[in-house]
């Protein structure tokens, strides 16, 4: 039976960080209502409703302007909700879809018009209910200008680096490339990501710190890693909250105001921080 994940903190703090105009949250998920958007039969989790209106209210508190909806694994390859929200809010949102390998080109074109800019794939270690590495569909979505958003597992970006770079698409690595923060900045997975960033083909999301450590907020072991990546290639970074933070059972639920304020610690330079929050997502997602 699928587990019901915990809710996000209902009382987000007003952050100390004053976000620049046009600031983007580059990684969120939306859910429900379940009567209209049911979870996939093989989804390992169910989530409470997290509507676009709820997220817009959060953005107003945080001072953010736009967002990138990543179609969640809980919906499998059904992107109906994503498409509906993009049609409803064409200026505020862009999307990342999970699609089937036999999706018609006409449907890819429709999704592109709606604002989908990439396809999410994951390490095979994350299961088969979501798309894994697939060069054939990557080549097809590249024809529509899409990038590949890839979520590694643990340190296996080392195994996937060359495969990803062989694709024609730009590559966006989720959640610090899933690298365990306890391994420090000299571990092979970190060096692999730095080399990938140097190619100019790869972007990295400063998002989901709770996916890289079992520590409670503010995730201090991740700070050296975040600073290293942001200093090495600020022009290749985007930031995301990962709201509504599903699958954190047994962990401390972060406050979204505090999550945004981590950028003050991770990227002390204001010009670089503003680039990560505004110019980079504008270029990557076409706002």
Which residues fall in each region the model found?
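Mid-to-C-terminal alpha-helical segments outside catalytic/metal-binding sites
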Residues: 2-22, 48-66, 228, 234-236, ...
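Divalent metal-dependent hydrolysis catalytic cores, especially in the metallo-beta-lactamase
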Residues: 40-75, 92-98, 116-124, 146-148
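Active-site gating/metal-coordination segments in enzymes
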Residues: 2-11, 76-156, 162, 203-209
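Hydrophobic faces of well-ordered beta-strands that scaffold small-molecule active sites
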Residues: 24-28, 67-70, 94-97, 119-121, ...
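Active-site environment of divalent metal-dependent phosphoester hydrolases
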Residues: 31-34, 74-77, 102-105, 129, ...
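Catalytic pocket-lining loop regions of alpha/beta-barrel enzymes
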Residues: 3-4, 131-239
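Short, electropositive alpha-helical surface patch
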Residues: 77-93, 225-233, 255-264
């Amino acid at each position: 039976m699928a587990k019901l994940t915990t809710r996000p903190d209902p009382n987000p703090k007003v952050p100390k960080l004053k976000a620049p105009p046009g600031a983007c949250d580059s990684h969120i998920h939306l859910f429900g209502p379940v009567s209209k958007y049911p979870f996939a039969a093989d989804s390992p989790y169910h989530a409470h409703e997290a509507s676009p209106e709820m997220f817009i209210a959060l953005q107003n508190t945080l001072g953010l302007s736009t967002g990138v909806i990543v179609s969640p694994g809980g919906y499998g390859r059904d992107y109906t909700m994503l498409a509906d929200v993009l049609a409803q809010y064409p200026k505020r949102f862009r999307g990342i879809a999970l699609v089937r390998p036999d999706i018609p080109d006409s449907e890819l074109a429709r999704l592109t018009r709606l604002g989908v800019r990439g396809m999410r794939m994951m390490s095979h270690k994350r299961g088969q209910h979501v798309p894994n590495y697939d060069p054939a569909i990557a080549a097809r979505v590249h024809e529509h200008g899409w990038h590949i958003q890839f979520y590694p597992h643990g340190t296996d970006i080392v195994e996937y680096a060359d495969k990803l770079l062989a694709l024609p698409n730009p590559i966006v690595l989720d959640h610090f490339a899933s690298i365990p923060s306890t391994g420090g900045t000299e571990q092979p997975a970190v060096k692999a990501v730095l080399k990938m960033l140097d190619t100019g083909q790869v972007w990295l999301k400063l998002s989901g710190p709770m996916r890289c450590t079992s520590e409670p907020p503010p995730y201090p072991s991740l700070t050296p890693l975040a600073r290293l990546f942001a200093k090495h290639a600020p022009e290749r970074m985007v930031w995301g909250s990962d709201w509504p933070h599903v699958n954190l059972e047994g962990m401390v639920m972060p406050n979204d105001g505090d999550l945004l304020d981590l950028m003050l610690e991770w990227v002390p330079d204001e010009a670089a921080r503003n680039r990560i929050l505004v110019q980079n997502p504008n270029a990557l997602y076409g706002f």
